[in-house]
Amino acid sequence: MATPANQNGRITQVIGAVVDVQFEGHLPAILNAIETKNGNNRLVLEVAQHLGESTVRTIAMDTTEGLVRGQEVTDTGSPIMVPVGLGTLGRIMNVIGEPVDEQGPVANEGLRPIHAEAPLYTDQSTEAEILVTGIKVVDLLAPYAKGGKIGLFGGAGVGKTVLIQELINNVAKAHGGYSVFAGVGERTREGNDLYHEFIESGVNKKGGGEGSKCALVYGQMNEPPGARARVALSGLTVAEHFRDQGQDVLFFVDNIFRFTQAGSEVSALLGRIPSAVGYQPTLATDMGALQERITTTHKGSITSVQAIYVPADDLTDPAPATSFAHLDATTVLNRAISEKGIYPAVDPLDSTSRMLSPLIVGEEHYQTARMVQQVLQKYKSLQDIIAILGMDELSEEDKIAVARARKIERFLSQPFFVAEIFTGSPGKFVDLADTIKGFRAICEGKYDHLPEAAFYMVGTIEEAVEKGKKLAAEAA
């Protein structure tokens, strides 16, 4: 179908990822997708600003090398549209919904715009049910909510991606519904590994179709900022469609910080004056527009797990600080813990969850979690004294508390299924009842006779006892 002449414009200026386009007698709406050809590729530009009466400033969703001034551009009349529905399962798409897995076109149940309003208050629903992950430190101290938003905070190289992959392994594989994974500005190698791992483990079938349970939407590190700033929305659109069909969807994002970072790269090119630490002035608005759409309605639920990179390990940086407000549970990864060789390197005193209430998790779970935190807090407060005067100067009571805290620290570690190839020890999924029983027994001193090493990298407390016997036999 030929487009009306006035819907065609011409490129007047190209500045990196930002392209200015002039139209005659027609101005595309903000957020509209406009298209042009770049070599043999379809290049989508998204309208970001109106400059004067006839020119729009757009953000390119792909590289702009090869574009020339005067080149013709067409207004599509709608925002970027991505395929949704069962055909997306088992497939990898990019930000504009094109397949990138070389398995042919994506069969879809229609197209949906990536920009949408958040559900109304009256449509939203909240559930107070726990999502059991099989990871001891998470289930005990900062349990996740079904249909909630979960953030994994951590600096570079402390294990966010490994933790998110373990959650996919433990939750998505056992989960009856569908999952969507949005790879935002992370390593292409990890995205590729995840795709093949899903096929090997039976979560997805090669080429998608019947039997596949996870859709993948990637805009990785090598993509221009426009793609990285929008790919989270493309993934969310696929997840929203499943939710509106009555499904319980798992939505994984790795990494939400790259969404902010891409926004800040584009913001400067659009001529906006930067705010604190050089971020875009619209940081809170951009984050809110994304996060408010990730919600559970009366039709279905979206449980989202988001990895959030913390620049220079500073949790007060505007990017992680803005995301804190939107989350139901935060899992904070700490470099000091990873340096001790304790993985997952989750900070038991810094991680929080609104689910840790006796009304939701029950009295026993709540009391055990608080006992564990109390012992660890006491150890933390004694560390200065230990560093200066040594353990001998502590009272008997404090010595016992420190010994228990060190055992708890090690018992919070756990071998992961996805890390088997690196560690050589098989992964462990620990039931919530076993987790509570084990930590309660350590706090009550039932295992004071076991050495610290017995608690390191085991699943249940029974395994720790076995390991203790083995260590004693080796020592003898």
From Swiss-Prot:
One of its GO terms (molecular function) is ATP binding. It is an enzyme of class 7 (translocase). Keywords: ATP synthesis, ATP-binding, Cell inner membrane, Cell membrane, CF(1), Hydrogen ion transport, Ion transport, Membrane, Nucleotide-binding, Translocase, Transport. Disulfide bonds: none annotated. ATP binds at G154, G155, A156, G157, V158, G159, K160, T161. Its main location: membrane. Its EC number is 7.1.2.2. It is found in: Cell inner membrane. It catalyses: ATP + H2O + 4 H(+)(in) = ADP + phosphate + 5 H(+)(out). One of its GO terms (cellular component) is proton-transporting ATP synthase complex. It is a peripheral membrane protein. Pfam families: ATP-synt_ab, ATP-synt_ab_N, ATP-synt_VA_C. InterPro entries: AAA+_ATPase (IPR003593), ATP-synt_VA_C (IPR055190), ATP_synth_F1_bsu (IPR005722), ATPase_a/bsu_AS (IPR020003), ATPase_alpha/beta_chains (IPR050053), ATPase_F1/V1/A1_a/bsu_N (IPR004100), ATPase_F1/V1/A1_a/bsu_N_sf (IPR036121), ATPase_F1/V1/A1_a/bsu_nucl-bd (IPR000194). Gene3D superfamilies: 2.40.10.170, Bovine Mitochondrial F1-atpase, Atp Synthase Beta Chain, Chain D, domain 3, P-loop containing nucleotide triphosphate hydrolases. HAMAP family: ATP_synth_beta_bact. Produces ATP from ADP in the presence of a proton gradient across the membrane. The catalytic sites are hosted primarily by the beta subunits. F-type ATPases have 2 components, CF(1) - the catalytic core - and CF(0) - the membrane proton channel. CF(1) has five subunits: alpha(3), beta(3), gamma(1), delta(1), epsilon(1). CF(0) has four main subunits: a(1), b(1), b'(1) and c(9-12). Belongs to the ATPase alpha/beta chains family. This is ATP synthase subunit beta.
